[in-house]
Structure formats: structure tokens, C-alpha cells
């Protein structure tokens, strides 16, 4: 993978679901919504001074949100931070850098 470039989209794994679950409260606070369903569908990664995870999350039958989560390097602060999100997405919308 090229540093700074986005990886290919991959199906979400249990680890990616855990990442999404950890930042769910941050997203709910920012959007002022509560999500009963919060299922990670696919993801891309971007290597920076840590890793950006771009995750497509299904929040309702036909509603999707793209979230961007930053994880710092282990020698730094490796906590997960929601750094961006895009609402109003569909199942077919491609994950892109934002």
C-alpha cells in the first residue's frame, strides 16, 4: 500500500466492527441520533501517522453512514477517534477519502 493512499475496499471483519462500535457514541453525539442498528459492511484503510479507517456502516434498512476513524501509532496515543462522517449514503456509494 502507498503511504497516504487508500487501500481497496474489503468486507468488514470483527475487528472493524469493534472499531465502529467504539466510536458509535461519538457519532451519535455529533449527529444527535441513536442507532439501533450499527453494522460495519466494508472498509478501507489509509496509512498516515497512524491509520485512518474509512468504514461503511448500515444504520437502517436503506441508510448508511461513512465514518472516518483515526488510530494513532502504538508509541503515541493509540485510542480511536471519530474524525469525520458522511450521512445520507446508500449501499452502492463507494467509500472515498474525506
UniProtKB/Swiss-Prot annotation:
Any one Gene Ontology BP term: keratinocyte differentiation
Motif residue range(s): Secondary area of contact: 46-50
SMART domains, sorted: CY
Keywords from the UniProt entry: Acetylation, Allergen, Cytoplasm, Protease inhibitor, Thiol protease inhibitor
Major localisation: cytoplasm
Residues annotated as site: Reactive site: 4
CDD domains registered for this protein in UniProt: CY (cd00042)
Molecular function GO labels: cysteine-type endopeptidase inhibitor activity; protease binding
Localization: Cytoplasm
Any one Gene Ontology cellular component term annotated for this protein: peptidase inhibitor complex
N-acetylmethionine found at: 1
Coiled coil segments of this chain: none
Entry-linked InterPro entries: Cystatin_dom, Cystatin_sf, Prot_inh_cystat_CS, Prot_inh_stefin
Cross-referenced Pfam families: Cystatin
Role this protein plays: This is an intracellular thiol proteinase inhibitor.
PANTHER family associated with the record: CYSTATIN FAMILY MEMBER, CYSTATIN-A
Family (UniProt): Belongs to the cystatin family.
Protein's name in the database: Cystatin-A
Gene symbol of the encoding locus: CSTA
